[in-house]
Structure formats: C-alpha cells, structure tokens
UniProtKB/Swiss-Prot annotation:
This is Deoxyhypusine synthase-like protein. GO terms for molecular function: deoxyhypusine synthase activity. InterPro entries: Deoxyhypusine_synthase (IPR002773), Deoxyhypusine_synthase-like (IPR023496), Deoxyhypusine_synthase_sf (IPR036982), DHS-like_NAD/FAD-binding_dom (IPR029035). The keyword Transferase applies. It comes from Coxiella burnetii (strain RSA 493 / Nine Mile phase I). Gene3D superfamilies: Deoxyhypusine synthase (3.40.910.10).
Length: 352
C-alpha cells in the first residue's frame, strides 16, 4: 500500500504556491480614472498631474526619458510594466538598483518566480526553509542562488577587464537572447534588443555581487571588475547627447541621485547642459529626514539638477499608483510618434 504522505506537499511547497502576477497596462484603460482624479484632491490630483507631465515628456520631440528605479516594485507585480515601457518606446535609459535588475527581472527571466506571502509569519521558520521575504512576498533562496551562479557563468565567459554595469547588463541581455531565457520579454532582454541602456551604480549590492565575488575568488589572477566611475561617465554622456531630459523616478536611493547628478557632472567636465526639464517621483519617504530618497524635486533645483516648471512629487506606494500612470500613457498613445533614441549604440564598440 502506498504511503499517502509521499504525495503531500511539504511546508515549503505550501508557502510557495501563489505566484505574484505582473500587471499588464495594455489590458485596462486608466484614462477615465486619471481624468477623474484630476478633479479630486490630495494624492489623487498629484498622480493626475504626474501623469500629465509624463505624457508631456512623450509628446516633446526633444525629450529623452530616463527611468530611475529603486525598491521592490518589480517583485511586487510591476515587472511587466517596466518591460512594456521599453517595448513601447516610453523610456530611453534606465538607472536601477542591482536587486531590481538581477534579483527580480533577470531572476524571473531564468524561469524562477516571486510568490505571494504574508508579513505575519515566523521569519526564523522561513530561514530554516530557505525562503526569503520582501514584506508579503516570498523568494526561494535556492532559486536565487542559481541566479547568482548564472551571473558567475556570464562573468567567466567575458574578457577579464573593467566593465561598466551597463556593459555587463548588456551581456546579460545577450545571454537571454541566445536562447537561455525561460520567460519572454523580460526587461533585461527587451532593453538589450531595443538598445536601451541599463545602469546599476550599486550593481554588486544584489545577487550580481555574489556571482561576481565567486568569479573573482575562482579567478584570482584573471577576473573582470565593475567600474562605477565609468557608469557615471557613460550616463553623463547620454545626458550631454540628449539635451532635454525627463525623469520618471520610482523610489529614491542611489539611482535617483545618480541620474540627477549627471547635470552637475557635465558641468564639472566643462559641458553646458540644461537641468532635467521634467521630473516625477513616486515615493513614501519622509522629506524631514534630510535623505536623498525623500528630498523634493524643488530641493533638487537648488543643486542645479531639476527645473521646477514640470515637476511632481507623488507620495504613494508605487505599485498602487504607477500602473494607472503607465496605463494612461500607453492608451493615450503619444509613444507611437516618438523616435527611438537607442542610446546603447553610443557604446556599441565597447560591448563586443
């Protein structure tokens, strides 16, 4: 007689049953909601104005749009949203945390998933089960370590020399495009295919860091390195080339400061560029702590980073407001008349 317990799922399998499903901005039209919010107050009206500014960026033929991405919204259900911004030519460059790009997007491109969980859980038990928690979202640590090892393999395949994070992520996109992707249309692969550069100024603060440390330990005399100074120079080169720029910033942190500072960096190296003409930030950070993440866009003007004519702070948890902004922009369709910038081509000879 068969042991019935053999077919029963383990506790880990029970906890990792419900996957996070990523929102599809093409399947619902948020225009009526945004139009209604424009006649409301508080955060609703702020979000409506931010959406209007984003649509203005898309209509401005001279404007290049840079997405700044921090936090865990990719794991929380916005992963396809970011990929669609690239697919439909609504962003021209991306500055993100390493976790957003590697631990979340590249991770799912390899066939792994994020799972719906609960913050009301015994975290010591999760640790024993090798389950990582991001508030109410779970990740299988064993899968994450497989992602780390993939970064290690990519690093081993490359010439041992300094790389910008943009260049290394380009090779990650090539890896996926060469038939290694288990999931279609990831952000990393679409950015590779559409020549949209992705920068992670704190690249090693992610799964990439574990893979690259392993690469250096195993190859002490012949290994690659990530050159964050080159990241800054390359992104500043894009700002100089672009002229007029608009920022869509989700969260704050290193990506926000990094992309804003391109104006200052250009000035330091003797180039005259305009401040970022348009800027939107969606955040829950409190301005009173004096941190970069919470600093207002008006404050950024005092540093010479952001103009104040078209700026909007939206104080909201991004997964609740960003899908409305992005859906509205998709359905208004101004992206259809934009020329792709393909800024990755500025560095094509360096990425071979």
């Amino acid at each position: 007689m068969k042991n019935k317990n053999l077919s029963m799922p383990s506790l880990k399998e029970k906890l990792l049953q419900e996957t996070v499903e990523h929102i599809d901005i093409t399947r619902f039209d948020a225009r009526p909601i945004i139009d209604a919010m424009d006649h409301m107050s508080f955060t609703s009206r702020d979000l409506a104005r931010a959406t209007q500014i984003f649509n203005r960026m898309l209509q401005d033929e001279q404007c290049s749009i840079i997405l700044s991405l921090a936090g865990s919204t990719s794991a929380g259900g916005c992963m396809k949203l970011y990929a669609d911004l690239v697919k439909y030519n609504m962003v021209d460059a991306i500055v993100a945390t390493g976790a957003s790009i590697v631990d979340m997007d590249f991770f799912e491109a390899l066939g792994f998933r994020h799972y719906q969980g609960s913050p009301a859980v015994e975290d010591r038990q999760l640790r024993d089960l090798y389950i990582d928690r991001i508030y109410d979202t779970y990740i299988d640590e064993e899968d994450l370590q497989r992602c780390d090892h993939t970064i290690y393999e990519i690093a081993n395949s490359l010439e041992p020399r300094p790389y910008s994070s943009r260049e290394f992520i380009h090779h990650m996109g090539a890896y996926l495009a060469q038939g290694k992707a288990k999931k279609e249309e990831s952000l990393v692969q679409l950015a590779y295919e559409h020549d949209v550069p992705i920068f992670c100024p704190a690249f090693t603060d992610s799964s990439a860091g574990f893979g690259l440390v392993l690469h250096q330990v195993k190859n002490p005399d012949r290994h690659l390195t990530i050159d964050s100074i080159r990241d800054f120079r390359e992104l500043t080169d894009i700002k100089i080339k672009a002229g007029t720029t608009g920022l869509l910033m989700i969260g704050g942190g290193v990506p926000k400061n990094f992309v804003q500072d391109t104006v200052v960096c250009a000035e330091v190296i003797g180039k005259t560029v305009d401040m970022h003409k348009y800027a939107i930030q969606i955040t829950v950070a409190d301005v009173r702590d004096g941190a970069c993440s919470s600093s207002t866009l008006k404050e950024a003007c005092s540093w010479g980073k952001v103009d104040t004519a078209y700026e909007q702070m939206v104080y909201a948890e991004a997964t609740s407001g960003l899908p409305l902004l992005a859906s509205d922009a998709y359905h208004r369709g101004y992206w259809k008349d934009r020329s792709p910038r393909q800024y990755a081509n500025l560095f094509k000879s360096e990425s071979k």
